[in-house]
């Protein structure tokens, strides 16, 4: 279907399907400054992405090792039905296959967090990414998606039903993983049940869903699906199709590790606020999405974080006799810090780090407060 002429001139829209080359607007320098290695573990080396099976009695130990060393892991045995995951992927593919004129009805406006368009992070960069995205809050799913399907017909009802079922499953899984993370910090099951802050986090944790479509690219060596970044919230579940493209950054030596596309598995990324919450014992992971010449790729990020008014600081249970490494911040405050970091090249986490014992003593009382 040809692109309407008014859309072809709209700077917010790029017709990836019609592209025969990568224009300068989408060409990124420095993509190959570091080598890329296989993370499947086929060679038995140190770059195998960790796997956590929630059915394993030693799952908490595996989470601790992965969160401390990698900041990410593949999650198996999570209990989310495979047929639901397949339905979610099919629904996402169908949504991005809609005509451009229909998708543009839901375009994300400046200052908005929800809607269709480029990744939200793209506003910080002069180059464009080889991807389309759609962001919505599960709490407002039906009203958000009416922008895309104003007549609320069959496609709208089916998409909403699939995403609502997925949200129910994922929200329950998030609570289980939060408990596993706390056990990984060294708490027993009984101690976790008694931690007041754990209940506050579980009860107030909010979710956001971001859908991604990475079209096949005529010159993938020049383009990038999603710029390298860390997630800002607590932790993220990533559901990806069976086309690899997610890469994690590793030091010593610096390299990109391609996460294998394992049927039924999800990727879990530790976010910046969870690094703060655990006082740096679990660290966020720098990651990106690359594109390829032969296949489209679909992914879904299910992001968990605190409500906007809640201050996040290191858990007392994570300190283990050490001073707090970070000051208390709300999520919006931290996003403001990240904006400065993007424009200056600084580290947002370093910008909220604290160094004095007095500051540390004050901030540990603020773990999760209004």
Swiss-Prot record:
- A Pfam family assignment: DIOX_N
Look up keyword Metal-binding and say if it applies: yes
Top-level lineage group? Eukaryota
Q: In which tissues is it expressed?
A: Expressed in internodes, nodes and the ear of the elongating stem.
* InterPro entries the record matches: DIOX_N (IPR026992), IPNS-like_FE2OG_OXY (IPR044861), IPNS-like_sf (IPR027443), Iron_ascorbate_oxido_reductase (IPR050231), Oxoglu/Fe-dep_dioxygenase_dom (IPR005123)
Binding of Fe cation, residues: 229, 231, 287
Flavoprotein as UniProt keyword: no
A single GO BP: response to light stimulus
Q: Which UniProt keywords apply?
A: Dioxygenase, Iron, Metal-binding, Oxidoreductase
SUPFAM superfamilies per the record? Answer: Clavaminate synthase-like
Q: Which cofactor does it need?
A: L-ascorbate; Fe cation
Occurrences of domain Fe2OG dioxygenase (ranges): 205-306
Catalytic reaction(s) noted? gibberellin A20 + 2-oxoglutarate + O2 = gibberellin A1 + succinate + CO2
Q: What is its EC number?
A: 1.14.11.15
Q: Where is the active site?
A: 297
Gene Ontology terms, MF aspect: gibberellin 3-beta-dioxygenase activity; metal ion binding
The record's comment on protein family reads: Belongs to the iron/ascorbate-dependent oxidoreductase family. GA3OX subfamily.
Q: What does this protein do?
A: Converts the inactive gibberellin precursors GA9 and GA20 in the bioactives gibberellins GA4 and GA1. Also accepts GA15, GA44, the 2,3-unsaturated GA5 and 2,3-dihydroGA9 as substrate. No activity with GA12, GA53, GA24, GA19 and GA25. Also possesses 2-beta-hydroxylase, 2,3-desaturase, 2,3-epoxidase and 13-hydroxylase activities.
Protein name per Swiss-Prot or TrEMBL:
Gibberellin 3-beta-dioxygenase 2-1
User: Which organism's genome codes for this protein?
Assistant: Triticum aestivum
């Amino acid at each position: 279907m040809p692109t309407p002429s008014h859309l072809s001139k709209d700077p917010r829209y790029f017709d990836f399907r019609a592209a025969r080359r990568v224009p300068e607007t989408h060409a990124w320098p420095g993509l190959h400054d570091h080598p890329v290695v296989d993370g499947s573990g086929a060679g038995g080396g140190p770059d195998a992405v960790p796997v956590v099976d929630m059915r394993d009695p030693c799952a908490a130990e595996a989470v601790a090792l992965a969160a401390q060393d990698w900041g990410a892991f593949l999650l198996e045995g999570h209990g989310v039905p495979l047929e639901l995951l397949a339905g979610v992927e099919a629904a996402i593919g169908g949504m991005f296959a809609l005509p451009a004129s229909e998708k543009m009805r839901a375009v994300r406006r400046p200052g908005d967090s929800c809607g269709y368009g480029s990744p939200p992070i793209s506003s910080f960069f002069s180059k464009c990414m080889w991807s389309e995205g759609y962001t919505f809050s599960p709490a407002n799913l039906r009203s958000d998606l009416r922008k895309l399907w104003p007549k609320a017909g069959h496609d709208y009802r089916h998409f909403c039903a699939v995403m609502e079922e997925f949200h129910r499953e994922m929200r329950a899984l998030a609570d289980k993983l939060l408990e596993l993370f706390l056990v990984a910090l060294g708490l027993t099951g009984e101690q976790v049940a008694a931690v007041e802050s754990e209940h506050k986090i579980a009860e107030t944790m909010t979710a956001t869903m971001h859908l991604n479509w990475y079209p096949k690219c005529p010159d993938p060596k020049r383009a990038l699906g999603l710029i390298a970044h860390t997630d800002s919230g607590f932790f993220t579940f990533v559901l990806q199709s069976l086309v690899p493209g997610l890469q994690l950054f590793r030091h010593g030596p610096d390299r990109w590790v391609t996460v294998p596309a394992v049927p039924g598995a999800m990727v879990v990324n530790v976010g910046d606020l969870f690094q703060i919450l655990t006082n740096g014992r679990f660290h966020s992971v720098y990651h990106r999405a690359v594109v390829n010449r032969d296949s489209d790729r679909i992914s879904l990020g299910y992001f968990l974080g605190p409500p906007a008014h809640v201050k996040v600081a290191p858990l007392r249970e994570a300190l283990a006799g050490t001073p707090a490494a970070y000051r208390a911040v709300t999520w919006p405050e931290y996003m403001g810090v990240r904006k400065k970091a993007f424009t200056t090249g600084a580290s947002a986490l370093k910008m909220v780090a604290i160094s004095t014992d007095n500051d540390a003593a004050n901030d540990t009382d603020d773990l999760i407060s209004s």
